[in-house]
Amino acid sequence: KRNFYGVGNGRDVTPYHQTIEDNIVAELVGELERRCAYAERRAAIRDFNRESRVIRKGIALTPVKFGISFTLTSYNQAGALVHVYTDGSVHLNHGGTEMGQGLHTKVAQVVAEEFQIDLDRVKITATTTGKVPNTSATAASSGTDLNGQAALLAARTIKERLGDFAAEHWSVPRDQVVFLPNRVRVGNQEIPFRALVWQAYMGRVSLSSTGFYKTPKIHWDRAAGRGRPFYYFAYGAACSEVAIDTLTGEYKVERVDILHDVGRSLNPAIDLGQIEGGFVQGMGWLTTEELWWDEAGRLRTHAPSTYKIPACGDRPRVFNVDLLEGARNREDAIHRSKAVGEPPLMLAISVLHAISDAVASVADYQRCPRLDAPATPERVLEAVDRLRA
């Protein structure tokens, strides 16, 4: 906690001279400590380790602060193409690639929310540069931020055209045209959304638009290592508890508690899934996924039989994941949400430190063990043996 960013007095400036304006890490960590009973469990684990000769437990709580944006500033742009058809359905194409992370669902939600129509009325087709050219990589956890904003701007352009047409067609003030779920209030009457679209088509109103978005405020001098490379930061914290076998080096992740900041979540189910998946992927990175070459320089861990990615059985026995309540991105990201792709990966550092904490108990916590990542059972056993030597 002594190393947390503070407020003012130079405690809120990064090494690359970006001021931290949305620092909530201390608040978030404090809330997780309370929820997972960190202090009480640490004391209980100390008591357990004094009585147990073979099995030792460890616990660790680690935070993460993850900057969101490409550090190559030119990548922070996106386009989208939206068509509204005369039956009231919407066709959407954007520059992001769906790879199972829920990007298409979130961007479709953004468009459906703007038009106030059901999600199943929005169809997304596969990303193609024939529709949206010069796409940026779907990376840096920025897919929803960039493509969601571009789609929102395209939809908003069409919505404004529809509103202007309705006001003129039914002779009412513009502020009396209100979009409601699947319908539009025009003065004292309500008409289905699809009926308004049909009337607009008959009135020769364009029902197609592109949208373009570029992330504001960011700049980065790579040579000098100075600037504001990130639009905002995503925060999270994880508390992990493990048990190790000091005779074999094998271990099990017994419990994980995560509290993560996603701002105003666009889709909590997707965000929770991303956090869980990112954490387990990070566990693999730090514990089992070892690259090993033989004396001839040949990679031997090149298949699922030797390169050990986490399986279902490696999942924590107890896995509690919560989104930070009341969080709201202070920057104008899409609907004040925050990115959630890569940040949770770093929360798995808590597993590595929990294993290290369990190993340290062998020497009654008097020495800090050397434990290299990935912390395979062999390396855990070596760390235990070094402390016993």
Model-identified regions with their sequence ranges:
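Conserved strand-to-helix beginnings and helix N-cap segments that scaffold or border functional pockets
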Residues: 104-105
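Conserved beta-alpha junction segments in alpha/beta enzyme cores
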Residues: 60-89, 94-101, 232
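C-terminal catalytic domains of large/alpha subunits in multi-subunit enzymes
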Residues: 1-64, 68, 109-389
